[in-house]
Amino acid sequence: MTATANDSRTLQFLGNNEITVLVSGSESGGKFSVMELVVQPRGGANALHTDHWVEVFHVIDGEAEWTLERDGSLDTWIARRGDTVVVPAGAKHRFAGAGDRPCRMITLGPPEYEQFFRALADAWQGPFDRERTPRAVGPVFERFGMRMVAA
């Protein structure tokens, strides 16, 4: 299988963050999706949330602040170039660009993962807003079996 680039592969989400589909769910025969995220400083998935699939993130440039539930408690740290973060299904997590330049990560998940980001890009075009963004993207989270949660 060889994936080729085209304009519909790059999406804007939660402001000026970008995700580029490298291998779509259909290109993998419905097995997985691979994407590149470009997360702006303090941008990203700022709301603590859970989902029902495993996600893998590999930092290829920059830094991201991660919060991830491990053994029932929340750990927060900075992931840097070369670090890989594995988010177990059902674990509370969030991430945001850290530092003063964008963070680039390769991420792997199921085909629904790509579909979620496409729906998220359609639902919210502006920067993250603590009051309005959750209301706008809440139905997208519900559709994909995800939940925004408290710490």
Question: Locations of the language-model features?
Answer:
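Acidic/histidine-enriched, glycine/proline-rich intrinsically disordered or flexible terminal extensions
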Residues: 119-151
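Glycine- and acidic-residue-biased ligand/ion/polar-headgroup-sensing regions
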Residues: 52-65, 69-70, 81
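A short glycine-rich, His/Asp/Glu-containing loop-to-beta-strand
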Residues: 9-48, 53-54
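Ligand-binding loop in jelly-roll beta-barrel domains
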Residues: 81, 89-114
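Short acidic-glycine-tyrosine-enriched beta hairpin
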Residues: 70-92
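Short histidine-centered beta-strand/loop micro-motifs
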Residues: 23-24, 44-51, 68, 75-78, ...
